[in-house]
């Protein structure tokens, strides 16, 4: 369908009716009659050659086609409304401050940012990185991307992606590792969690490392993988965040066994109101990750 044939009034009527699941409430919101909403929806259904609503025992319901169309319109109208508001207040740039755990920033977010800037040029994005210990209120952050179980005090958290952990090491060390037990011939590199290696060894069917085993602790998986590339030992880290190193063969994943100790989440303090820019960023990021 070309732009000249896009039925904007019918789409507005459908979006309001679908959001409220009521033609009456949609008519009140748009300041038109119930009959006008009904006619616009009927016209849109004829143009799309499909039914968008059905009437059930509990009232108006969306069809599968209606459910597919609604989020697209929600996003489009939100973006248009947000831009018009910014022009009206002479603020064409909306600032957005994000704190991102370094591993996710390098392994996932940074490669995607050019797409975000193309799609949302009106958002002035400020990014700071952290090592999963962060104070969003003190730092004035709109969103914080964290690793963990999804529960933080007075915080809303939305799931982004998994962070399955597995051993990673240099090709030189990998050539000397035939079984999981062979990993214990080398220093073990880990983050602040003491039980990572014990849990992975258990999943691989091996005994945990000795309490006296040579272990190096890092506050960032990024610096830990730098050490692993240099042959300083075998790291345990979220594989998904280091696909760029795996594809270039700078590091190797010697075994497919993985453990689930946490995931990545986008979080917001409940005391912080959600702005249009925040909603746009969250919707964009979850969209690209969940494709």
From Swiss-Prot:
Molecular-function annotations in GO? DNA-binding transcription factor activity; sequence-specific DNA binding
An example of a Pfam family matching this protein is: HTH_1
Q: Which residues bind DNA?
A: 23-42
Stated family: Belongs to the LysR transcriptional regulatory family.
Please state what the protein is called.
Answer: HTH-type transcriptional activator AmpR
Which residue intervals define the domain HTH lysR-type in the entry? 6-63
Instruction: Show the PANTHER family listed in the entry.
Output: HTH-TYPE TRANSCRIPTIONAL ACTIVATOR AMPR, HTH-TYPE TRANSCRIPTIONAL REGULATOR
Q: Does the keyword Transcription feature in the UniProt annotation? A: yes
Keywords attached to this Swiss-Prot or TrEMBL record, sorted alphabetically, are:
Activator, Cytoplasm, DNA-binding, Transcription, Transcription regulation
Instruction: Give the record's GO biological process terms.
Output: DNA-templated transcription
